[in-house]
Design a protein with these regions (language model features):
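A charge-rich, low-complexity, intrinsically flexible signal that marks solvent-exposed coils, linkers
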Residues: 1-104
Length: 104
């Protein structure tokens, strides 16, 4: 195998790893943000888990975060503004990424 092939394989492996980590970070962020929103909605017990799953699956509608933001804005009408939701999502993502780095 040539140096070029080895380099190509290394870049492909890094890309796959980065994509996997981004997916895991988004999933963890969505879980945490779903639990936060469930609390604002007054949900308890199994309803928290069910609502959190709704938030997680909402992220599969399209690429990016807009599908999750739309769901939360609609569900949290009067309880949190779009700006508050986006700020919370960004803060939680930073926490999740920091935790993932520490986990290795």
């Amino acid at each position: 195998m040539s140096t070029f092939d080895e380099r190509e394989n290394a870049f492909e492996a890094k890309y796959a790893h980065d994509a996997e980590m981004a997916f895991k970070a988004s999933a963890r962020r969505n879980k945490a943000i779903g639990q936060w929103a469930a609390g604002l909605l007054g949900k308890t017990g199994d309803a928290v888990a069910a609502y959190t799953m709704e938030v997680i699956t909402a992220d599969f509608e399209e690429d990016g975060d807009e599908d999750v933001v739309r769901k939360l804005v609609r569900d949290l009408d009067g309880k949190a503004t779009e700006a508050e939701i986006r700020t919370k999502m960004a803060a939680v993502m930073l926490e999740v990424k920091d935790k993932m780095v520490k986990e290795g």
